[in-house]
Structures are given as structure tokens and as C-alpha cells.
UniProtKB/Swiss-Prot annotation:
Its main location: cytoplasm. This is Ribosome-binding factor A. One of its GO terms (biological process) is maturation of SSU-rRNA. One of its GO terms (molecular function) is ribosomal small subunit binding. One of several proteins that assist in the late maturation steps of the functional core of the 30S ribosomal subunit. Associates with free 30S ribosomal subunits (but not with 30S subunits that are part of 70S ribosomes or polysomes). Required for efficient processing of 16S rRNA. May interact with the 5'-terminal helix region of 16S rRNA.
Length: 127
């Protein structure tokens, strides 16, 4: 299948899933979660859905477990919105930790900048 078509399907699924998670899921265990990316297999049988979750590790685990239990509902809602597709991919939910990693890198950079301000590097006059 053409890459452009796969990307269109992935983008549409990302939009639908993001809206459904934010507005239609009534499970109180689902915290603040957003769909960051969807990758669809070439045969449209599988879709990796990357989800970013804010909160403590326990809250993130609880939210991810609740979303896993809601996979059937999520897939059904995608099917209702994408009626033109013959098959709807099986959803594989994956926690996206790239935002956490980038926040960690920013913290490390800030710490290094702070240390350089407090203890500037010495330049020896003698060479």
C-alpha cells in the first residue's frame, strides 16, 4: 500500500483516538493521556498507538491498564468513524516515554548551566 495512504490512515486514527480518549472514555482511572503517534502496518492489520501519559509512575501504569481494557471500545469507535475501510487495524497501545526523556535531558542541561554559572571554568593565564 502507498506510504501516503498509510500515513493518512495513521493520521486519521490518531485524531479519532485522541478525541475519544479525551471526551468519550468515562473510566476514572484514565488520567491525562494523549496520542502522540500511530504507525499502521503495510497490510493495515495492526496499528501501534503511542500514548503519552502525565503523572506519577503509578498513575501512568493505572491509566495504561485502563486504556488496554478499553481497546475494544477504541477500535469500535475508530471503525464507526472510518466506515470507508474494510478492516480496522488491531490496536497495540504503547506508552510513549520520549517526552519524559526530553524533559530529563532538559533538566540535565539546566543543571550543567547552573553549575557553570556558580563555578565558571577557570582559564589559566599561564600557557
Amino acid at each position: 500500500m502507498a506510504k501516503q495512504r498509510l500515513q493518512q490512515v495513521a493520521d486519521t486514527m490518531q485524531r479519532i483516538l485522541g478525541e475519544v480518549i479525551q471526551t468519550e472514555l468515562k473510566d476514572p482511572r484514565v488520567g491525562f493521556a494523549s496520542v502522540t503517534k500511530v504507525e499502521v502496518s503495510a497490510d493495515l492489520q495492526h496499528a501501534k498507538v503511542y500514548i503519552s501519559i502525565m503523572g506519577t509512575p503509578e498513575e501512568r501504569a493505572t491509566t495504561m491498564a485502563a486504556l488496554q481494557r478499553a481497546r475494544g471500545f477504541l477500535r469500535k469507535r475508530v471503525a464507526e468513524e472510518m466506515r470507508h475501510m474494510r478492516f480496522i487495524p488491531e490496536l497495540h497501545l504503547i506508552e510513549d516515554t520520549s517526552i519524559d526523556y526530553s524533559l530529563h535531558i532538559n533538566d540535565v542541561i539546566r543543571q550543567i548551566q547552573h553549575e557553570r554559572m556558580v563555578n565558571p571554568p577557570r582559564i589559566d593565564d599561564e600557557q
